[in-house]
Swiss-Prot record:
GO biological process, alphabetically ordered: DNA recombination; regulation of DNA recombination
Name recorded for this polypeptide: Recombination-associated protein RdgC
Entry keywords, A to Z: Cytoplasm, DNA recombination
CC terms in the record's Gene Ontology section: bacterial nucleoid; cytoplasm
Family named by the database record: Belongs to the RdgC family.
One of the record's GO molecular function terms: double-stranded DNA binding
InterPro entries cross-referenced by the UniProt entry: RdgC
Biological source species: Escherichia coli O157:H7
Organism superkingdom: Bacteria
Location in the cell: Cytoplasm, Nucleoid
PANTHER family: RECOMBINATION-ASSOCIATED PROTEIN RDGC
Taxonomic path: Bacteria, Pseudomonadati, Pseudomonadota, Gammaproteobacteria, Enterobacterales
Length: 303
């Protein structure tokens, strides 16, 4: 279903036109098509509502959700190595000589081309939420690389996409460290029982605390010894729990049952109406959380 699990947050660095009607046509030019026999990977747009709609965008209250699909061919290294060694051995026996490195490299390409049509495919989907009201773009993934790949596809589709990772005026890890040291987070937030602390020294250690009182003397001693908090589990207004990371990303989002059940009165058979209602609910909550978080972390860095 729609509920995002992670958030990589980006700021639009200047205003651009993001009208859904126009975007629908632009995304259609980069719609997903499966890998051909010689493609290692393909990426493109699919309807965020899956088989329930052909639209590549879903819009509500100035919020747009889109979905990218990626197909990757799986060719394990041992399979390539085995096929290549067999081909090299066969040719060396036929020609009664050792093959040069350039010849072996050329053979590797041949082997890849011969194996590709028979390779299995791995599919993945990444949802992206565009907040045109606040000038933010959120990608539902846990890695910056995956987020950047999805943003690159959108940039190619639109022709231009001036975005930068959302960054704070003060280093996030120092703010998180102060929250743990004082035992109190910013207004609206509550410390949970999980954190990661890292030494500022290059060869320093990493401490991962789970199901632990973060106000305990043990954690305080690590901070006094020079470690900083790089990940911190937080609760926001008893509505959403998440792990705040020092790169500005939010991981392992967990919406409270009361929130998720808010649209239970909608007939489950009416997928489109439920999708729309959940999208409005989720984006409204997350937009408020992000704004609250920016304020709590000391404000955004000047652009």
């Amino acid at each position: 279903m729609l509920w995002f699990k992670n958030l990589m947050v980006y700021r639009l660095s200047r205003e651009i036109s993001l009208r859904a009607e126009e975007m629908e046509k632009q995304l259609a030019s980069m719609a997903f098509t499966p890998c051909g026999s010689q493609d290692m990977a393909k990426m493109g747009w699919v309807p965020p509502m899956g088989s329930h709609s052909d639209a590549l965008t879903h819009v509500a209250n100035g919020q747009i959700v889109i979905c990218a699909r990626k197909e990757e061919k799986i060719l394990p290294s041992p399979v390539i190595k085995q096929a290549l060694e067999a081909k090299i051995a066969k040719l060396e026996a036929e020609q009664a000589r050792k093959l040069k490195k350039t010849e072996k490299d050329s053979l590797k390409d041949e082997v890849l081309h011969s194996l590709l049509p028979r390779a299995f495919s791995r599919f993945s989907q990444t949802m992206m939420w565009i907040d045109t009201v606040n000038g933010l773009i959120m990608v539902d993934c846990a890695s910056a690389k995956k987020a950047e790949d999805t943003l690159a596809l959108l940039r190619k589709s639109l022709g231009s996409l001036p975005v930068v990772p959302l960054s704070m005026a003060n280093p996030i890890e120092l703010t998180l460290t102060e929250w743990v040291r004082s035992g109190s987070a910013a207004q609206g937030f509550q410390l949970l029982d999980e954190a990661e602390l890292k030494s500022l020294l290059e060869d320093g250690g990493v401490i991962r605390a789970k199901k632990q009182d973060l106000t305990s003397e043990e954690i305080t001693n690590h901070i006094e010894a020079g470690k900083v908090v790089t990940k911190l589990a937080l609760d926001w207004q008893q509505r959403i729990q998440f792990v705040m990371c020092d790169d500005g990303s939010l991981k392992r989002l967990k919406f409270c049952d009361e929130l998720r059940d808010q649209n239970e009165d909608i007939d489950r058979e009416d997928f489109a109406q439920r999708f729309d209602a959940d999208f409005i609910l989720m984006t409204g909550e997350l937009a408020a959380l992000i704004q609250n978080l920016i304020e709590g972390l000391g404000g955004e860095a000047q652009r």
